[in-house]
Amino acid sequence: MTSVKRLAEICGGTLTGPWQGVEVTSAAIGSRDVQPGGLFCAVPGQKVHGATFAADSNAVAVLTDAAGQRIIEDAPTPLPCIVVDDVREWMGPVSAEIYGHPARQLKTIGITGTSGKTTTSYLVEKALLDSGLKVGLIGTTGTRINGKPIPTSLTTPEAPTLQALLARMVAEGATHLVMEVSSHALQLGRVRGLHFDVAAFTNLSQDHLDFHPTMEDYFQAKALLFERAEDGQQPGTAVICCEDEWGERMRDIAAQFSSTVALYPQTKNDSAERPEANTNPAWAITSAEVSASGRQHIGVEITGAESSRKLNYSIGMAGAFNQANSLVALACIEAVTGETLTSESPAVQALADVQVPGRMQLVEAGQDFLAMVDYAHKPGAVQAVLSSLHDYLPDPQARIGIVLGAGGNRDHEKRPIMGRIAAELADAVFVTDDNPRDEEPSTIREAIYAGAREGVLKKKKQQQDKETVCEIVPDRAEAIAAAVSWAQSGDAVVIAGKGHEKGQLVAGVMHPFDDVEELANALAQRAQAHSEREGRQSESSEQR
């Protein structure tokens, strides 16, 4: 237990109400989540202040601001309050104190970037587990402790939930933590009070401009993982993917605070200038080959101040961007373990078998074309997936179809951009619903479709158009079926946007929906229809 007096000392807060002798055993940001004996972190809401619900919670004390304190003071039974200017700024350090600073007992890796966080974290988790270590994972697809799933919601949980999870991981024997760190989490202070031994940056492309007013603001939010000057929590080692100007800028920022490992994933047409060997190592992909089965065989050169070495490994996932993800993963593993990796290391060998739900996930039902589900829901990710498919398909005449939507109540500007990219790189675009949330679905579809039509016109001007199909199919299951019906032998179909998700959020209601299941159903129905046609043709032939 921790006294509220001690917590007030940590955050420099003012104590009000009957605080003497009060101790807390847990913390929560949701009033309904407060356990008996817990601290309620009451923050201002969009409509009402969280402190309004303090009296109905199990809280024995409240961390809040001046506005929240006034609400609690006027309640029939006032609770002890720790009053601070910014509750979110102090939730992390206070929660860490309550739970005994569990992160100090873990080797921690934090991964940020627009795309690739989930795949990279999966790769790191598998490699560490195969090396005989106990590992906790927190990210978009959920939380796991030593491979066992633990229900969570946000990519990066709120600080009280996060610290409770870390304490549970330590209690269950975990020694290492692999964690996705979103820009929201950094901006809202969810990881304050948590030191990362290794912090990694994958890439930056347009997304979340509903939350960040500009790309520069988005970049600066990501950079907080490496600066974090407000609480002296800079990472021990920074791993930076330097494939463009964003990566180069992040490398320069990180180098001011941490030992920095620069990564260069592009094997050709490099836009990033590779520095000469210095005291900081640089990892560069020197070769990448795709086998007939789709497995990628990758060669890496690692250079330092006085020497260089080579590393060869395989991954079972398609896409040039997964080459980059694997490079980030290996650099993180070497940094956190202190082991000099070789091609024979268990951690390196482990990457060959990793499959990530909803990330370039192949769905096979005996069809003669490629069918996959991917989480791509932002312009950069859509471009990366479609470009990778062009490189992946053996027949240059093979066609690519994409089912595409966009989330409601999110960045509006990216919708036509996604549509345009899809039409420029694919041969068929089936515009449909993603998670409309509280928006009118047709408005979202029309924005994507407008961009797609722009892409088609651009291809026609360049005389590149092969009669691109561009259709609006509102029902997502029907759109998936339409794409499957369109595909011919040797083609590829990708269902983009929802990936691992198991539901579709429409007007505040979550409806069961799984892209992988729907794609499998559509493939089965196509196979059945084909079988029935063959049966009728055979029957007709016999009658003649």
Regions found by a protein language model. Give the residues of each.
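Short glycine-rich anion-binding loops that position phosphate/pyrophosphate groups of nucleotides
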Residues: 45-47, 183-184, 206-207, 244-245, ...
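Acidic, Mg2+-coordinating active-site environments of NTP-dependent enzymes
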Residues: 68-77, 198-371, 456-466, 470
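Receiver (REC) domain switch/active-site residues of two-component response regulators
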Residues: 60, 197, 427
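Short, flexible loop segments at boundaries between secondary-structure elements
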Residues: 209, 511-544
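Phosphate-binding loop of NTP-binding sites
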Residues: 8, 90-259, 330, 536
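Active-site beta-alpha connecting loops in nucleotide-dependent enzymes
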Residues: 45-48, 356, 380, 388-460, ...
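Short acidic-hydrophobic, aromatic-tinged amphipathic segments that line or gate anion-handling sites
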Residues: 81-86, 471-474, 479
